[in-house]
Amino acid sequence: MTLTLVKAWTAAKDRLKDAGIDQPSIDARLMLEVAAGVTRTEIVTDPYRELSAEQIATLNDYLERRARREPVSHIIGRKGFWKILLQVNKNVLTPRPETEVIVDEVLKAFPEHMAFSMLDLGVGSGTILLAVLAERPAAKGLGIDASSEALAVARENAANLDLNTRAALLHGDWTTGLGSDSFDLVVSNPPYIPTEVIDTLEPEVRIHEPRLALDGGPDGLAAYRELAPEILRVLKPGGLFAVEIGYDQSQAVEALFRAAGATEVRTVKDLSTHDRVVLGVKNPLESPA
């Protein structure tokens, strides 16, 4: 029996819907694009193109994995973020649209042709670092992560985006070994989910994503307690920081950064109107160490 693109998409949507998957239409299309080697446009403009037996087998494998709640990004090995396409796997946190709030705020603060240095703590797949560097050609950045497997993904992404000459990637423990007053910008999407909450999350997250990137300790604030004074240390006077937070952590995280000496501390909401990013500045009058 022949299977066309339109029939394959319809069957895939139905199969995912029956499996209780959210957004079955989008997931089915993304997996069909990769399995059949087509674009979204081709599915619409050439709907009666037939799939080969190999393509059908690949799509069926993808659908079985998705029905077991493996994330689509892990199945197809990629995820769009901001204006870039990133390679992803089980060793990195899947980029989320709410993290784009950090990129948006950074681009507002740093004009297009401005030269500046940035640090991304817990760089993962390179999500924030590479999205910013792709938009700011005069900028250079350093990404640090405790996971060597995550760094391998980030290096691949930097190379694929031709950003490896401006993005340095190092294995390390947050800011250990970094000099004071070194960066114009520090960003981070640290683990912020309370330990006991992780087991209540959807299977795509609790089973398939690295716990190191999720677990924020008993109250979800462990990373921020460590990061706040260190981010203020490595920032240049007048430098900006932006960190992602959980929806209910704004007050606590703002307080930690104020206690560390930050000024102009504020919280920005995401498109779902949840508190998402805490920003602030290192006192520009502070003398370099």
From Swiss-Prot:
Keyword S-adenosyl-L-methionine on entry: yes
GO terms for MF: nucleic acid binding; protein-(glutamine-N5) methyltransferase activity; protein-glutamine N-methyltransferase activity
Signal peptide: none
This protein's UniProt keywords: Methyltransferase, S-adenosyl-L-methionine, Transferase
Stored InterPro entries: DNA_methylase_N6_adenine_CS, HemK-like, Methyltranfer_dom, N5-glutamine_MTase, PrmC_N, RF_methyltr_PrmC, SAM-dependent_MTases_sf
Transmembrane regions: none
Keyword match Coiled coil: no
Binding, substrate: N189, P190, P191, Y192
EC number: 2.1.1.297
Domain of life assignment: Bacteria
Catalytic activity, as annotated: L-glutaminyl-[peptide chain release factor] + S-adenosyl-L-methionine = N(5)-methyl-L-glutaminyl-[peptide chain release factor] + S-adenosyl-L-homocysteine + H(+)
One Pfam family recorded for the sequence: PrmC_N
Binding site for S-adenosyl-L-methionine: G122, V123, G124, S125, G126, D145, W174, N189
Disulfide-bonded cysteines: none
A biological-process GO annotation: methylation
Role: Methylates the class 1 translation termination release factors RF1/PrfA and RF2/PrfB on the glutamine residue of the universally conserved GGQ motif.
Recorded family membership: Belongs to the protein N5-glutamine methyltransferase family. PrmC subfamily.
HAMAP family assigned: RF_methyltr_PrmC
Cited NCBIfam families: hemK_fam (TIGR00536), RF_mod_PrmC (TIGR03534)
Protein name: Release factor glutamine methyltransferase
Organism field: Caulobacter vibrioides (strain ATCC 19089 / CIP 103742 / CB 15)
